[in-house]
Amino acid sequence: MASQISQLACFSSTNRQFHFQSRSFPCPMIRPQSFVVKSVDGNSSETPASLSYTAEVSKPVVEKTSKPYSTVDETATNKESITEPVEEDVATQPIRAAKIHDFCFGIPYGGLVVSGGLLGFAFSRNLTSLSTGVLYGGGLLALSTLSLKIWREGKSSFPYILGQAVLSAVVFWKNFTAYSMTKKLFPAGVFAVISACMLCFYSYVVLSGGNPPPKKLKPSATSPSY
């Protein structure tokens, strides 16, 4: 009888100790998490709240990863917009050339020299004036005509301009020498002045870079040769 009473006393003491430990150390695993979710979202279900929270957190990550690509595209477009005006400026740069073509005055000048030699021979019967007029005047006419032909083809007529400048210098020197010896204004004085003006004109065309290019080239000149 005494042993049964002692067993009951031991059982009651262990039961009290178990209840005391369960009261003093509660398990905080599930309830605080459900309480935090309910206090933030205000929903009764726990699973949708956690899913919405993870979706909201993932949005800034996507935005952050997409920003560097957008900045790279913006920098690329900015570089293209900067380089385009430079290319346009290079393409629209004007070509350095004279305002007037050499043959515009070269052909009339050559014809005037030839006619002056013929008139001088007709009045004075001087073979020197005839040879000078025909030789140098014919050379000026030939060079001016060739310069016009080459210019129409879109090629450079710079050598023909230099040739006309040399011939005009020779005609000027001969007529100036004849005028200084005879003191006759016509024809030596007049041709000396005209030749000096033409020499200045040819010098201007040469220093300016030659004749200006034609506005419309022929198809044969623009098409590449194979």
Curated annotation (Swiss-Prot):
- Does the keyword section mention Transmembrane helix? yes
Q: Which InterPro entries match?
A: TMEM14 (IPR005349), TMEM14_sf (IPR044890)
Explain what the UniProt record notes about the effect of disrupting the gene for this protein. Answer: Reduced biomass and male sterility. Reduced size, thinner inflorescence stalks and flowers producing short siliques containing almost no seeds. Small vascular bundles with reduced secondary cell walls and modified cuticular wax composition with strongly reduced content in C29-ketone wax components.
Where would you find this protein in the cell?
Plastid, Chloroplast inner membrane
The stated induction of this gene product is:
Up-regulated upon induction of early leaf senescence.
GO molecular function, a single term: fatty acid transmembrane transporter activity
Where do the TM regions start and end?
130-150, 158-178, 186-206
Report whether Chloroplast shows up as a keyword of the record.
Answer: yes
One GO term of the biological process aspect: fatty acid transmembrane transport
GO CC annotations on file: chloroplast; chloroplast envelope; chloroplast inner membrane; cytosol; plastid
Checking Gene3D superfamilies in the record gives:
Transmembrane protein 14-like
Its predominant location is: plastid
Q: How does it sit in the membrane?
A: Multi-pass membrane protein
Q: Where is the transit peptide?
A: 1-39
Q: Where is the composition biased (Polar residues)?
A: 67-80
> What is noted besides the main data?
For all TMEM14 proteins, 4 hydrophobic alpha-helical domains are predicted. However, NMR structure determination of the human TMEM14A showed that only 3 of these helices are membrane-spaning while the amphiphilic N-terminal helix is probably located at the lipid micelle-water interface.
Family statement drawn from the similarity comment of this UniProt entry = Belongs to the TMEM14 family.
What the protein does comes down to:
Mediates the export of free fatty acid from the plastids. Potentially prefers palmitic acid (C16:0) over oleic acid (C18:1) and stearic acid (C18:0). Not involved in fatty acid activation. Required for biogenesis of the outer pollen cell wall, in particular for the assembly of exine and pollen coat and for the release of ketone wax components.
Protein name, entry field? Protein FATTY ACID EXPORT 1, chloroplastic
Organism expressing this protein natively: Arabidopsis thaliana
Underlying gene: FAX1
